[in-house]
Amino acid sequence: MKRITLFTILSALFYILPLSAEEATYQDLRYTLDENHLTAEVALNTQATGEIMIPEKIIVGQNTYTVTSIADRAFKGCKNLQTIVLPQSIDRVYRSAFDGTGIMLNKDNWQEGCLWIDSILIATDKTIKPRFIVPEGTRLIAAGAFQGNKTIVRVDLPTCITRIDHETFRDCKNLQKVVIPPTITSIGEDAFLNCGIYQNEKKWKKGALIIDGCLVATNKLLPAKYVFKSKKPIRLIAERAFAEREQLKTVVIPNTITVIPAAAFYQCENLTNVTIPATVSHVHKFAFYGCKLLKQATLPTHLKYLGMGVFYECENLREQVLSDSIEILEQGTFYKCHTIKQITLPAQLKRIDHGVFAGCSSLEEIKLPNTLEFIGNMAFAGCAVLRTITIPEGVTSLPKQMCQGCTRLYRANLPDGLYAVGDEAFAGCLLLEKVNIPKSTFRIGVRAFHNCQQLESIALTPTNIHMIEEGAFQECKMLMDIELPERLKVLSDAVFAQCISLKTIKFNQKLREIGTGAFYNCRNMRELTFNDSIQVIGDEAFAECKNLRKVSFPITIKRIGVSAFQNCESLKQPLFPPEIQIGKNAFKGTRK
């Protein structure tokens, strides 16, 4: 069966949720940026040649990013890449980053079976000694550096190394011993998969493989209730160590553990209870991803970090109280945790990333702290029973789909200083009755309030609104009166389409153009008085407004679009000077 890697999980998450990372080019090299941590990873650069010097920091826009890693296959196949200088800030080099490069193909770059770049062990070959002592002064070992090497029998790691990266010793069939120093703080996924140690049944105890106090893997013999036991205290769990163990129901993590690594309990679908000790300071990405029966996972009061998608689709997870030490909730942390009703957010929280609470269909209440500065796309989308939300003043822009599909949300309190309401921010909030638009607001996004069926009124004046985008208030079926903001010059397509209760619209003095279908099927509208600024009425702008009886057109009008007033049954077709461009069927179905 094909193994599901962390890369696969990330790809799936990014398919569902918007990416929080972005790419940028700096001095002819491509980087992937992490805005949460202001770090950069050297991305795929397949055209690299000659000599390259990676900088320690790059500047993109207003931010300075520290370059910390080289991506998987970053320079793979760059045969003309002869030299590369890596900064001290690099702490990870992913698998195959330099495969097929001129650096790897040049035999002069190899020493005793090892390829080194700036004190980083990149790769090994069959000429390595069977017992290899990694020298002190080695900065790090690249992911997969020993992978598939059949020569090595024993590896002694130095105290200067802090991480064994993913697939480092994978498929090393003759490897029987690795000396892991206490300085090692993390072990990547599949670091020992199918190596000689892994294949030796005598090394396994009760379904777990433990090396020098590090639990590196588990198998099908793992009991339903796992208690950490070893001659040495278990101080470390490898990434994905318990992943997909369907038999696992209960885990008591000992107080010798300080970190729960990435995907540690990924898709343990029958896991119901996890005891996390107070010693744990970091819970990394996807740690409990897809643990659908998990009910209890009490987080330590002094937890410092909660990673991306930690409780993603933990459908039975109950109330959570988050440590005040946490400043960022990363992407998809509680995505589709259907049974969470309440959650206590950190007092110093600054950022809620994309989709953090999306699909939390039982979440009744959430109090956002005043320290909050950023809310990501879909942060509360699909929180079907959430009733109210108050956005703190530090938030200056509402993201896309922030509360989309919050079908019972009836009130949204927006802060002074708000600049924009994002696309579909409140779309499908069927019971939304009250929302204040601050004076500072510049833009209301595409379908921002689409299908808010109980929204009776919304004050667009006095505000700084320059843009109301397509379908912003489409299908707001209870909306009765609208006064357009004074700075608005163009009314976008379908803005008030199918607002079937809309009776009056007060146009401003600067409006020049009304977009396609802007008031389509506003069937309770009876009278229109345009100001002298109006020049263009778009296609189907007022089509199907069946009770529209009177329209006063200004002399400034230049074009009336196709089917602009089609099927306005109560409207008598007006006469226009010949210089006005009138589209086909503009008044079809009106009284003559």
Write out the residue ranges for each language-model feature.
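Boundary at the C-terminal end of the N-terminal hydrophobic targeting segment
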Residues: L19-Y26
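Consensus positions within tandem repeat domains that build extended binding/scaffold surfaces
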Residues: D72-A74, Y94-A97, A143-A145, D165-T168, ...
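Non-globular, low-complexity intrinsically disordered regions
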Residues: A40-E41
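Small beta-barrel nucleic-acid-binding modules, principally OB-folds
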Residues: V216-A217, E540
